[in-house]
Regions:
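A short beta-strand element within beta-rich, extracytoplasmic domains
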Residues: 84-96, 267-282
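Short, aromatic/His-centered strand-loop micro-motif at the edge of beta-sheets
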Residues: 108-127
């Protein structure tokens, strides 16, 4: 499996309201500004949203917490199923409280539901959905809970809709009994692709559960860059709040280098690493972002974001993911690993 996206929400400040008014459009806009791409739509009624930690059976879980008096549904659009099979994993935690239904459907794919019962006490389960599409256009999807098969479904999808299939997480009905509020927490997400074999056959590569950690920026170098408010660049890079300012990257052949905090792989259990850049495009319409990721002497290719439709009024996130060292098939070394990115603001015709 090739893991292409990771999301643990830990880059969002803890225990602070995500936005001022909890309308769906405001919440999605705030998630975009924080670089979240695995959740691209939502519906429902919520009274608060924050990144926080909850203890379930003495185990602390971290994620994005939605407080709701009724229901909330989060949507994740899958990669094109015509190109590969897809596996999506996430942890879904519901707080203690009388549940509205004894046989609810908290997870759906393309509108087709799986039964996912939760007890009245707090509970946290790790789910993985594996989906394939055969040559006749029929999608088969299986849901696994803590590695055990929880359900199957199938449906037809035309060729022009294979990149529009959504997984919905949450419920369109009340989650808790009438008149009661509770919390839904989503965390530790990943999305991966699995290559098709003969006749579009593919098998899941279940992980069971993962923990997505976060490495903040620890250092910055680059003489052609500055903070938009003339404040500390490192603080600005670690903060989505505009009060800390943003990095302004001037056109230059010189790379600006961002170094991240060490990744702990002392147990050799590192599955994947993702570096992401959230940015607004340059005022100059013929310029774009180019960037690479490296770890020590292992440096990946420079990616030029020529085709990204970013603008100066909204935030766009691009990412690079690795299941081995950035320059090839060399496994991650055990111990601490330090990653860095090199950033360029340059004409779109350069570094092709």
């Amino acid at each position: 499996m090739n893991i292409i996206n990771l999301e643990g929400f830990r880059q969002i400040p803890a225990n602070e309201g995500l936005c001022e008014n909890y309308y769906s459009t405001n919440i999605i806009s705030a998630l975009n500004e924080n670089g979240v791409t695995l959740i691209n739509d939502m519906s429902g009624s919520v009274t608060s949203v924050c990144r926080g930690t909850q203890a379930v059976n003495t185990v602390e879980r971290t994620g994005l917490i939605f407080t709701t008096p009724s229901y909330v549904t989060l949507y994740s659009t899958l990669p094109d199923l015509k190109a590969s099979a897809v596996q999506l994993g996430f942890r879904l935690t519901l707080s203690a409280g009388k549940k509205y239904s004894s046989s609810p459907s908290h997870i759906r794919i393309n509108g087709y539901s799986f039964t996912t019962p939760y007890p009245d006490e707090a509970a946290s389960y790790y789910y993985e959905i594996f989906a394939t599409r055969n040559e006749n256009g029929y999608v088969s999807a299986s849901l696994y809970c803590n590695r055990s098969l929880a359900g199957n479904t199938s449906f037809y999808v035309s060729d022009d809709r294979t990149d529009k299939i959504q997984v919905s997480i949450g419920s369109g009905d009340n989650i808790f009994s009438s008149g009661a509020s509770g919390t839904l927490m989503l965390g530790d997400m990943y999305c991966g692709t699995v290559a098709y074999g003969k006749n579009n056959s593919a098998e899941p590569a279940l992980l069971g559960a993962i923990e997505v950690r976060y490495s903040p920026v620890t250092a910055f170098t680059g003489g052609s860059a500055k903070n938009s408010l003339d404040k500390d660049i490192v603080t600005g890079l670690n903060t989505s709040d505009s009060d800390a300012g943003y990095l302004m990257l001037s056109p230059s052949p010189e790379a600006a280098q961002v170094t991240f905090g060490a990744v702990d792989n002392s147990n050799g259990d590192l599955v994947a690493v993702m570096a992401a850049v959230t940015y607004r495009s340059a005022d100059a319409p013929n310029n774009c972002l180019a960037w690479s990721v490296k770890s020590g002497s292992h440096e990946g290719e420079t990616v030029t974001e020529n085709d990204v439709q970013a603008d100066t009024n909204s935030w766009t996130t691009v990412s690079q993911s690795f299941t081995t060292q950035p320059d090839g098939d060399i496994p991650f070394t055990e111990g601490e690993i330090i990653f860095a990115t090199e950033l360029y603001n340059q004409p779109t015709t350069s570094r092709q």
